[in-house]
């Protein structure tokens, strides 16, 4: 097997596919597959995605992403720390398992158009200015910009099929979900916040609050917030560079 930075095989045989996938996992390289596939997810919920052409990316940290030919976000994904393996069934199946909470993502590879292994070296960190990441850091440094007694606990917390920007508790012990926007917030942001709150309320009841944090919001977003019983906090993204990493605490 070549040890070049990149190894690419188009229309690989099953043996070539197995060899490249195992090589990527063993070498902790980045694996990319263009394929026609089906996807099955089993975890807190269940979902099925029928046959279609997609891009599958497996990163050295265990991140597992499945992209369609539209939208920015993956249609299915698993977070860092997940374990990945290839199983030979009727068709080859990529399996990603998250241990806690237990979640399994299976991708049946019906036809593989291309598989690549990228032996990437990248040790830099991104310094974001005026972004949602900077807003989150400001909130961790000064929680009272949200409200007195607010205690932020998690950043980028996986909830269902999405990621909450900041998760914490208020002075009354309620769980608080923060959806951060560095620009004017629109209806989509409210709907996203609503979905996170609904997921958490299924488990924790009414002791869950949702707060949209942004410099401003549209009139439609304001009406929907009020209708859904959600809240708004005005906050401008800070204009500074930072690479600090906040320590995350436990929610319970």
Curated annotation (Swiss-Prot):
<keyword id="KW-0255">Endonuclease</keyword>
<dbReference type="InterPro" id="IPR011856">
    <property type="entry name" value="tRNA_endonuc-like_dom_sf"/>
</dbReference>
<comment type="function">
    <text>Cleaves both 3' and 5' ssDNA extremities of branched DNA structures.</text>
</comment>
<dbReference type="InterPro" id="IPR048302">
    <property type="entry name" value="NucS_N"/>
</dbReference>
<dbReference type="GO" id="GO:0005737">
    <property type="term" value="C:cytoplasm"/>
</dbReference>
<dbReference type="InterPro" id="IPR049173">
    <property type="entry name" value="NucS_N_sf"/>
</dbReference>
<keyword id="KW-0540">Nuclease</keyword>
<dbReference type="Pfam" id="PF21003">
    <property type="entry name" value="NucS_N"/>
</dbReference>
<dbReference type="InterPro" id="IPR048301">
    <property type="entry name" value="NucS_C"/>
</dbReference>
<dbReference type="GO" id="GO:0003677">
    <property type="term" value="F:DNA binding"/>
</dbReference>
<dbReference type="InterPro" id="IPR002793">
    <property type="entry name" value="Endonuclease_NucS"/>
</dbReference>
<keyword id="KW-0378">Hydrolase</keyword>
<dbReference type="Pfam" id="PF01939">
    <property type="entry name" value="NucS_C"/>
</dbReference>
<protein>
    <recommendedName>
        <fullName>Endonuclease NucS</fullName>
        <ecNumber>3.1.-.-</ecNumber>
    </recommendedName>
</protein>
<keyword id="KW-0238">DNA-binding</keyword>
<comment type="similarity">
    <text>Belongs to the NucS endonuclease family.</text>
</comment>
<keyword id="KW-0963">Cytoplasm</keyword>
<dbReference type="GO" id="GO:0000014">
    <property type="term" value="F:single-stranded DNA endodeoxyribonuclease activity"/>
</dbReference>
